[in-house]
């Protein structure tokens, strides 16, 4: 599905049911394949159908508002054929009443909707610490989801009883009403009011789940976080979504990761960035200093004559490549050279002597350039 469902129908996110229906009627009339012969009309019509199917039902609309399309992926499909209109039939009868002979009677007979259905996919947003994202590991999470009722094994019926075929629709889940007009005959197909489209009626409902066949439960599970994930990474945990209906397979759980910022380290792809400060003498003479990395403390060699803001590299100390943790990026360290604003009299004399020795005491860009106004402090 391309685009936001509200944008597809051209309505605001807080629109009412009547406004939603008007927008749907207008667009469905415009893009119905029997009316609009443009190459993209059929695909557009499917998008409009899918958007209205989700937003017209309060329960699926609430899930969509909260989780996006992942939250309603089990509710129908974008490519559903036109023969299974269900509750759309009354709208289409109105939309196309002006087109002679065209109506829902042109579609196939009502198709039973009471078979096994896949459970909905679920979304979980999970925050990770900086190092958790780099090295991965196991994470325990808790998810509320629908599980098959253990009391009735998902049938919805009280123990020792079973569901009966609906006498109103004879198990089809739909009822049809024929209407004759000067423009032709129309058949209005709608969801059976007795069984709610299930095709079956439960006389004695399971006391545990109230006849739904599923119960809301909170489940604890451990998931594996691969090394090298980043904010925006999506993990799929198979079969950990809502339980299916009437023996259908469960949906999947999609975990969206967000990585917390770190006080010392930043990330650029598979490289880690940080900064250290050294004295001007360390920059001039060189040194070996201890630096923090995600692996712990490491030795970093400061070459003599290091220039301010020079970037030194610790190879292989960066982020593992996602899917290939043996391959790692580098740790790039920007070295800040700290120039003192005040020095002791002895230090100043020594620096003057050094400047005279180099013949650069008053020349720009020499020691005086490096040390700023150090020689002129009183």
UniProtKB/Swiss-Prot annotation:
Any coiled-coil regions, as ranges:
none
Q: What is its main location?
A: cytoplasm
Give the required cofactors. Zn(2+)
Q: Which residues form the J domain?
A: 4-68
- A GO biological process held by the record: protein refolding
Enumerate the CXXCXGXG motif repeat regions by residue range.
149-156, 166-173, 192-199, 206-213
Zinc finger intervals, CR-type: 136-218
Q: Where does Zn(2+) 1 bind?
A: 149, 152, 206, 209
Which keywords does the record carry? Answer: Chaperone, Cytoplasm, DNA replication, Metal-binding, Repeat, Stress response, Zinc, Zinc-finger
Spell out the molecular function terms from Gene Ontology.
Answer: ATP binding; heat shock protein binding; unfolded protein binding; zinc ion binding
Homology family:
Belongs to the DnaJ family.
Give the quaternary structure. Homodimer.
Q: What does its UniProt record remark on the domains?
A: The J domain is necessary and sufficient to stimulate DnaK ATPase activity. Zinc center 1 plays an important role in the autonomous, DnaK-independent chaperone activity of DnaJ. Zinc center 2 is essential for interaction with DnaK and for DnaJ activity.
Its biological purpose is as follows: Participates actively in the response to hyperosmotic and heat shock by preventing the aggregation of stress-denatured proteins and by disaggregating proteins, also in an autonomous, DnaK-independent fashion. Unfolded proteins bind initially to DnaJ; upon interaction with the DnaJ-bound protein, DnaK hydrolyzes its bound ATP, resulting in the formation of a stable complex. GrpE releases ADP from DnaK; ATP binding to DnaK triggers the release of the substrate protein, thus completing the reaction cycle.
* Name recorded for this polypeptide: Chaperone protein DnaJ
| Natural source organism | Picosynechococcus sp. (strain ATCC 27264 / PCC 7002 / PR-6) (Agmenellum quadruplicatum)
Q: What is the lineage of its organism?
A: Bacteria, Bacillati, Cyanobacteriota, Cyanophyceae, Oscillatoriophycideae
The coding gene here is dnaJ
